[in-house]
Amino acid sequence: DDETTFPCNSGRCACLPEDSHSYTCQSP
């Protein structure tokens, strides 16, 4: 889901690995 996942270099938030190929954007 592009609205809730971003590459780790997004910079807008802390990106936590959700699985082997996606990341969840979480406010720091």
Swiss-Prot record:
Record carries keyword Transport: no
Annotated compartments: Secreted
Reported tissue expression: Expressed by the venom duct.
Entry GO terms, CC: extracellular region
Post-translational modification: Contains 3 disulfide bonds.
4-hydroxyproline PTM positions: P17, P28
Molecular functions (GO terms): toxin activity
Chief site of localization: secreted
Keyword set, alphabetical order: Disulfide bond, Hydroxylation, Neurotoxin, Secreted, Toxin
Keyword Secreted among record annotations: yes
Top-level taxon: Eukaryota
Comment, domains: The cysteine framework is IX (C-C-C-C-C-C).
Name of the protein described by the UniProt record: Conotoxin Cl9b
